[in-house]
Curated annotation (Swiss-Prot):
Predominant localisation class: cytoplasm
Subcellular location: Cytoplasm; Membrane
Superkingdom assignment: Eukaryota
Alphabetical UniProt keywords: Cytoplasm, Membrane, Transmembrane, Transmembrane helix
Protein name: Uncharacterized membrane protein C21C3.06
Gene Ontology terms: cellular component: cytoplasm; membrane
Taxon lineage: Eukaryota, Fungi, Dikarya, Ascomycota, Taphrinomycotina
Organism, as annotated: Schizosaccharomyces pombe (strain 972 / ATCC 24843)
Record keyword Transmembrane present: yes
This protein's record includes keyword Cytoplasm: yes
Transmembrane regions: 9-29, 60-80
Signal sequence, start to end: none
Membrane topology listed for this record: Multi-pass membrane protein
């Protein structure tokens, strides 16, 4: 019976719900762990000056990576909802069809089209 209720949920909605909850939980975990001042730092000012920039970099990297992944997932879900596809495979096929201009296409006589070419094709 629970499976029947889940069958009516669109894939896009499920992905959006999971990405939103993942973003909220990861933000909470970051706030509770690495964004806090860790207890293992010594009161030594030399060690503090050596480790402090690394800690700031780690905080920025962690926050921006979580934010980037959640924003990408959220944007993908919005795009999928806008174009009317329900799963990732359809979205990939749609993108492949629409972005066909970006595929490499063979150019006829590309070597011999230059006036001063030194390659002879026999």
């Amino acid at each position: 019976m629970a499976f029947d209720k889940l069958a009516n949920v669109a894939t896009v909605d499920a992905i959006f719900a999971i990405s939103s909850s993942t973003f909220l939980w990861s933000t909470w975990v970051l706030q509770r762990t690495i964004l806090k001042r860790p207890n293992f730092f010594s009161p030594n000012p030399v060690v503090e000056k050596m480790v402090h920039p690394t800690l700031i970099t780690w905080k920025l990297f962690s926050f921006t990576s979580v934010l980037t992944v959640s924003t990408f997932t959220f944007a993908s879900c919005l795009i999928m909802r806008t174009i009317g596809v329900e799963n990732i495979k359809e979205f990939g096929l749609y993108a492949r069809e629409k972005l066909s201009f970006a595929r490499a296409k063979p150019v006829k006589d590309d070597i011999t089209s230059f006036p001063n070419h030194k390659i002879s094709i026999t």
